[in-house]
Amino acid sequence: MTTLDESLALIGRGAEEILKLDQLEARLTSGVPLRVKAGFDPTAPDLHLGHTVLLNKMRQFQQLGHQVIFLIGDFTGMIGDPSGKNATRKPLSREDVLANARTYEEQVFKILDRERTEVRFNSEWFGQMSAADMIKLSAQHTVARMLERDDFAKRFGSQQPIAIHEFLYPLVQGYDSVALRADVELGGTDQKFNLLMGRGLQEHYGQAPQIVLTMPLLEGLEGVAKMSKSLGNYIGINEPAIDIVTKTMKIGDELTWRWIDLLSLDISVAEAVRLKEQVTSGELHPREVKLRLARELATRFHDAATAEQAIAGWHAVVTGQGDTSLLPLQEVVVPAEGLRIASLLTAAGLTPSNSEATRKLKERAVKIDGEVLEDATRVFTQGFEGVIQVGKRNFARVSLVIG
């Protein structure tokens, strides 16, 4: 049986803040399974590793015997969460929201236990609300309080428009906790204002206020900006296993520890400390730790056999030994006259620009099927298929087709 200290250690792993810790301890001590909620607005069809930070924490609550609520914000998704935004979000259509929501349901059970998961839609209660009900809800907060939010304050100070419906978003998210009688709500650090709104509304409606647990925003592949599809620094959980492996193996050594803390369900805190000590002492190469994380992620979102095949493909390119046909084939569209190598590297996503590609060619850092490319003016035409590598970590198996 898990002790209170063990439960708190698992719940607190990677967390930025828990409000209020003493209330969490009291509810855990009661022995009654907690209702743990996290909301996801279906603004895009695919989830990426950044989204799984909250899903992993939900899974840890499930491991401790608690019930989690995966709340799909089909109603709030049409409003658009203003958190962290310096401009009004474009609202989504009902059709877009529902299509995205369907894909979410398919993806989350790669992490969550179906038996301990409620999937809910907040249109269940907001679809029944009258205009009078919404006005009553709006009366629970003031404009002055809303402007305490950093993003709203900045936009107000710089005379950027703030639409009235954006003020409603925190109230609507907060009311979700009332409707679901949540004991705990999880969210990113940028959601703290909205999560605290839930506490206040629950008290107003005579419920015990939920515990708020915030998680950090996961840094993307480059280790600086938060993971985002718009920035291209993400790993989608529906991506092929080879892409999950190769992208994970490209991250920096320091970022590896951060990802382990927020993404791994297999490596305990104690083991992570031990691994870090082994790397520091030189007993273990950082690549081995990264490979273990890559294997775990590829297995979670696919299966063990597929993960091992992906690792074999990655290893074949890195070492120059093995079967590179295990790598996924990426089609690159070229004109009839073909593309010079610099343009091909950029088109294949191996360099951010032709100038960077030219620099890599001058450094003799470009290989074709394991051989250094000596001719920086070489033109590639339809029918070419092979593995192109830039530096140690960037590679792709490409096939050229005429568009």
Swiss-Prot record:
A Pfam family this chain is assigned to: tRNA-synt_1b
Keywords for the protein's UniProt record, in alphabetical order: Aminoacyl-tRNA synthetase, ATP-binding, Cytoplasm, Ligase, Nucleotide-binding, Protein biosynthesis, RNA-binding
Primary residence: cytoplasm
Residues spanning the signal sequence: none
Molecular functions per Gene Ontology: ATP binding; RNA binding; tyrosine-tRNA ligase activity
Residue span of motif 'HIGH' region: 42-51
Enzyme Commission code: 6.1.1.1
BP GO annotations: tyrosyl-tRNA aminoacylation
Aminoacyl-tRNA synthetase is among the record's keywords: yes
Motif 'KMSKS' region, chain ranges: 226-230
Binding annotation for ATP: 229
Cytoplasm is among the record's keywords: yes
Enzyme kind, highest EC tier: ligase
Family, per entry: Belongs to the class-I aminoacyl-tRNA synthetase family. TyrS type 2 subfamily.
Name of this chain's protein: Tyrosine--tRNA ligase
Organism: Xanthomonas oryzae pv. oryzae (strain KACC10331 / KXO85)
Gene: tyrS
